[in-house]
């Protein structure tokens, strides 16, 4: 596994930060926010792309691609995957980005207005388009199998891993390098999400991203990438790979309701969760833990709560539910992948992190949202992602037993 996040630029740093309850929120440094209501973001700190590629390659990639190549490199090294010993056409890539490069668009649009269309850079399109994350990862590491770029807004990372899982199930790959990446903390990115009233305008880093809290007022935009190496079980055993957990279920649905709001009754998200459990052959009452989408917006946290109650009935009150976004913010297309890595570590270590900043909930939000952390066996973990456009995806993980 590999991770570039607002609280650490490796899985180890990220996970240590999670256990410490560390938050990655601070004033936006990429541009002057004097005219913006939103002042905070969860930026990646101290990232040096030349640790993962040469300077020429770094110059020919936008930051969302640099993050992806870095996280993928960490994951491939962690997996001990030696491409010279693999059939490269059976090793694929499914790394998605919800937006691509807003930086490239802003930069070249300014050039267009100032100097005319003849001065727009020839690299604009290949720098900008979101599929270049998967393209650059494949090029960097020689992955010649199926290469996908899933774009489902905030569900991108989860769908990317899910589609990689299906690819292996169908026999189209032995190994898939999968995850999500995003870097959209830019003037137009912040202005656009602010106009939707999706972002928190709090200037207090401790009270900005507070999923399920009654005072929540929007999400904090984050950035980064997480990538995992998914592998067919027998293939992994044959080469003596480290196996952290098993991915056993993938469920999807569409709300077909609204371009930004989840379905109010939670039916779409509930269907995705139940589909993942059915796919994995796990009865709902066997599940003890859900990593929620938990964005800290009024609608998401309320409607996701309704979805969990709809899917699990009274058993919903026995589940432990947390939100990793309480520490790293909303990484958009990378969010689901970062939360997948979180679930793997929680299963591996028998630890469920707390939802940082959660103080008091409103009447309908009456489930266990993990005000405190728990040290206990985690046999299964379900992780949810709900994207603009009504895209719902859930992944079911299982503790690996040799």
Region locations from a protein language model:
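Condensing-enzyme catalytic core mediating Claisen C-C bond formation in acyl metabolism
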Residues: 22-26, 204-280, 289, 402
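Flexible, low-complexity linker/loop segments at domain and module junctions
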Residues: 85-88, 280-286, 317, 365-402
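Active-site-adjacent elements of ketosynthase-type condensing enzymes
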Residues: 33-43, 100-104, 183-209, 251-271, ...
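Active-site-proximal alpha-helical scaffold in enzymes
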Residues: 68-81, 130-134, 138-182, 220-241, ...
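Glycine-/small-residue-rich "gating" segment that lines the acyl/pantetheine channel
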Residues: 114-121, 159-162, 166, 182-238, ...
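Conserved beta-ketoacyl condensing-enzyme motif
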Residues: 11-15, 19-152, 181-190, 286-300
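A glycine- and small-aliphatic-rich helix-loop capping segment at beta-alpha/alpha-beta transitions
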Residues: 12-16, 103-117, 167-170, 190-203, ...
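ACP-dependent fatty acid/polyketide chain-elongation machinery
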Residues: 1-57, 234-246, 341-355, 398-402
